């Protein structure tokens, strides 16, 4: 019944009272009465809630008609319809706006010309026109719908009358249906009465039978009642039947191949078809043309049941006899064979249904198509499906069937959507078990997956080389016993199995992995690739976790790859599944090592994040813009894997990781320099499995070094090639006190050198010489990751300089005492009782930015400079000229240098000893009487402060020999004792001669040995001066100095006493500049050193 839209005034009313204002009241008045829905107008007792009413007699004698049932089903308020339409309009408008927003409108390519009316046509692109059409269509459609609402609104105002019409129509239909039902019942009654009819009785035949006892009209068949059989007669007849059957089967009947197994007994023949049935047949006549008759059948498979008595047994009996009559034994076999095959399929179908409703619920899907049973297993597993089909297989040409051309039950296995051979499936046609069949199929499927995964894993180097082991345990009948054991690391193993019912892969690690690795086990796909991928991921996770836990013990810090993940992935191969970054406090900040793991192998990588000058100071700061400079694989294993039996394997690993960073940084630096030959190249740099850090072999040739790395020597020091050109740089661990990497450079000297090892102090660890050989070793320190190549070249050139100085000293017959890269100590003097130390200094090492290989190759000026110095320990008398000698060593002139310094040491030794003895005091309370001012190594000023006399002692050429010349520079003014001192000087020195010296009238000239006698004679002239001697005006404010009396045993020639030699004084050194050196141009340019005693 269609629904009616009612406005709020009429919804839900069951009946209506008479409305006198209704226009139809007067129109519907007939025969003096008015009826609305079966109620008479003016009836005061009408109950609107009653659906029907039995009429009562009225005053006029008429009965009131019963009230019609009021229909309210399907009525709903008009407001609900309006709300639905409005809501639908709003939703469609929102969808239209979204759709129009997705349409891209192309901009105006050019401004079009305005039409004659001056109005712009707007954007007339196809997209914009399409938008406008969509809006217009939407508006027209909604307008039409709301017009319909308007019509319904107007019509609903008259819904009261329509409701009455509906009630009337419902009444007419119900009466019509009652009429149809009455006709139907009458027809059925007429049909049923036919069976109740009884034929008229045959009274004549009845009277004849009752009177005569027989009916003459019936024919006599001549049957005689048979005699009762005795046991012997029955046995005789059975034997006869047996002979008839045997003769017939042997001579006449064509026996099908499956019926070749039979036995004749008890008057019947029993045909045995293995795995199917036993059939008993017998004959009804001796003729060979008579048919066999069915006696009994027994099924030979389980589960099976006998054919129940009744209709089914009768139908089978009749069907078999018909087949025997029409087709003989062959037709009978074909019928029974097909029946058995169908029965077996139905038995397996019922078992499959029971499994699908039991433990295998939601994992099996069973479908029977004619005589083909389809069982899909692992139904919830995504990807290609797997199922087994059991059906009747034609035996034509099949040698494995029970007979030529005999159908049999066949299996068709679809594994992951592809048909595979089903011969290995365990299926017993005599003992039907769907569960055993499924277990065999699933076991074969699981064995295939695990064996395929095992084959793929065995091809990887980790398993093919025996580093890790794997084992597959397979079973063709029991899927729960199939598993794959994989060794993840030395201490962790993984067992892979597949749940038989659902096909879900189960991964069980021993010991268990962390939670982040267990999330990978949520995948339910068990294809071979996914299975291998999951095993690979777990192996990599286990390897990285085990490595992290052990490496942290060694003091390494894990670096978060949060800001580097995208860039660092480009450094590693695509097959890397897991990696972890480590850093050690003894390394440079821009170097880390990365442990990468994949199913093909594990690797250690050295990664340089960025150049040293650009590295942040803290890894904790997340910098997502850190650029990677380089990365290099240093090993093909995690190194410690092959040393699991050693307890010290991981400490060795810590040593190896630091060595990897240190060696790679230096090889990378050499590779960038390009001008230095080295081995191994950067691409071949590897760490062996025995944790041996490779050494770097460097060809050392100063001439081929970049100009910036060639050491600049002083002009007086000649460069010599004293080292062989092959140097081996080796890593020797970490210095824990200095937190730096230790490098040792091994090399060999050119030519024989003796006693070098005795010259090097045992406390000096920077340089070692091989005893009895030409080998040497240099020790270098630097943080791991900072190259030591510049330091190495600087040390090698310094060593050559040191050996050159040592060779020169030995040529001058000086005795070397000690040797290092910073100094050479040697003994000199007639008795080798004096020692000097030649210091070897280098310029400050430039910053790391200046040492960048790119900048070094671009520079044309040198960065490294060597300076020499000389120092003397107390009481060496040459300490007065120490500064001057150092200036001569580093002078730019080729005439200066070590050769000149050794000559000066020999030439000035008597003078220096005399001055040292004179200026030495017995006690520190004794005042100075002589001031010695050193202008340079060959010019001295002698100042007697008490008397005010100044003398200059210089070198000069005299008679072709180098001599000393003493001259008086100035004299004090007239004062007490001045004339006596003048006279004493003239008498003692100027006009006198002595051992090795001669007076010149206004001075003294002396040879190398005689200058000491001159100094002693000069000092003797002033020894007797008194404390109240006249002092120069400029010295009045100075401290009083008491003179030391000359010992009585001191001779005029200058032989000092032991007491005088034992005196000690305080020396004050002042450095001034003076260019008055008269020895030669070289000496005149040296810096003057003034020593005041």
From Swiss-Prot:
Keywords: Activator, Nucleus, Transcription, Transcription regulation. It is found in: Nucleus. Component of the Mediator complex, a coactivator involved in the regulated transcription of nearly all RNA polymerase II-dependent genes. Mediator functions as a bridge to convey information from gene-specific regulatory proteins to the basal RNA polymerase II transcription machinery. Mediator is recruited to promoters by direct interactions with regulatory proteins and serves as a scaffold for the assembly of a functional preinitiation complex with RNA polymerase II and the general transcription factors. The gene is rgr1. Residues 19-31, 1040-1056 have a biased composition (Polar residues). GO terms for cellular component: core mediator complex; mediator complex. This is Mediator of RNA polymerase II transcription subunit 14. It comes from Neosartorya fischeri (strain ATCC 1020 / DSM 3700 / CBS 544.65 / FGSC A1164 / JCM 1740 / NRRL 181 / WB 181) (Aspergillus fischerianus). The lineage of its organism: Eukaryota, Fungi, Dikarya, Ascomycota, Pezizomycotina. InterPro entries: Med14_N (IPR055122), Mediator_Med14 (IPR013947).
